[in-house]
Amino acid sequence: MSFSTETKNELARVISGNECCNIAELSALVKSGGSIQIVGYKKLNLKITTELNSIARKVFKLLKKNFNINTTISVNKNQMLKRNNSYVLMVTSEMGSEMLLKKLGILEDKEGFFTINKISENLIKHEGCKRAFIRGAFLGGGSISDPEKNYHMEFVTNNEEFADSLKELINSLGFNSKIVARKNNHVVYIKESEQISDLLSIIGGHHALLSLQNTKIVKEMRNNVNRIVNCETANLSKTVNAAVRQVENIKLIQETIGISSLPENLQEIAKIRIEYEDMTLKELGEMLEPPIGKSGVNHRLRKIEEIATDLKKKS
């Protein structure tokens, strides 16, 4: 099961105790996942389609609880395409679809029916209603990426005016959502992990929030470990290359002018370096008598390198 599906299943279980919040959520669900069918003069059917049984059950409960509408859930099987089943709820004109759509702020009756694309201000007067509306919009047309891959939460609609209105609502709560056109749709999206976490929290996706944060922590730890390993690998490679170069310098001196021609302090470090090629500068310094520090060893080896460089130029 995808992270997006898990999140939707969790949010589908959230039922507000306030009627106003339920109506706001149902309005968003219908705007995002519903369609209106004209079946006669001033007669409409409302069709709500979803791929998740949990969302279908939630719509069924909200219709029954807040509007006393008893509808049925039918299942469309997609056997040939091997895709998920889709669940369809139909509210007919006889059931009161026109009354429902008016109360949801979707339909206006002015010498004929007109659909309202903007979010009705009457539906989102209270903070809880705003959160419920966003939750409904996500359940109706939203998705969220697996945090293992990237951070992306979006709300898809085919209506530009509704997309603008939804973006304004989300941003009124302190977020920075944006809109992008995708084929024939308009997508309201958020990409920052912190903002996605906060939005999940206010719409009731607490388990999804914890899962996202845990995944983020693991990713950051993994990245830190990789950085440390890469850094240590680079340092080790640098140390090995330096040791190889130092030994080559000493062998060149040995084959040309002889190590005995070097000052006594350089002879001492040269003999130890060529005998113990794998030792660190610190370990080399501890073998000298008297012992010297890492910087002292490095200074002597640089002197040897200068002599070897001069010999190369002369040859």
Swiss-Prot record:
One of its GO terms (biological process) is regulation of sporulation. It comes from the Bacteria. It holds the Pfam family HTH_WhiA. The keyword Cell cycle applies. InterPro entries: Homing_endonucl (IPR027434), Intein_endonuc_central (IPR004042), Sporu_reg_WhiA_N_dom (IPR018478), Sporulation_regulator_WhiA (IPR003802), Sporulation_regulator_WhiA_C (IPR023054), WhiA_LAGLIDADG_dom (IPR039518). Keywords: Cell cycle, Cell division, DNA-binding. Residues 280-313 bind DNA. Disulfide bonds: none annotated. GO terms for molecular function: DNA binding; endonuclease activity. SUPFAM superfamilies: Homing endonucleases. Belongs to the WhiA family. Involved in cell division and chromosome segregation. PANTHER family: CELL DIVISION PROTEIN WHIA-RELATED. This is Probable cell division protein WhiA. It comes from Clostridioides difficile (strain 630) (Peptoclostridium difficile). The gene is whiA.
